[in-house]
Amino acid sequence: MFDILVYLFENYLHAAACPESEQLARKLSAAGFEEDEITEALDWLSGLRAIAVSPLAKVPQPDSIRLYAAEEQAKLDTSCRGFLAFLENAGALDPQTRELIIERTMAVDGFHVNLHRFKVIVLMVLWQQEQPLDSLILDELLTDEAEELAPVLQ
């Protein structure tokens, strides 16, 4: 599923440029993705679209502190929660977008959500909302933790 999400980000500048689900499924199949992966990714994106257009029940105040439920802590490890706090403190996210990211992370089934996958979720939520991204934040989202840990040889 995550490979498909990255593929969509790389191939469609804006979420609005994405074709309808049936046509997109055919294009993804032609690109070599498996049917079950396509279905899972399209279902996840459909959930993102549905929740993005419906207002959240309670919009957090900008100066509020986010406490995570036990299920959220189990799904979002400390590196993911720390990265989310970093983005919010940097001004890249508002509280409503943060909640949308958490909701979409909780909607991921069958995968351990490591920091790399979490960055893909964040990227897709911001892509769907067509929010402008600072180039340093975008670089941070596109950087894989394996690249960060790789030794620099000169």
From Swiss-Prot:
Disulfide bonds: none annotated. InterPro entries: Smg. Belongs to the Smg family. This is Protein Smg homolog. The lineage of its organism: Bacteria, Pseudomonadati, Pseudomonadota, Betaproteobacteria, Rhodocyclales.
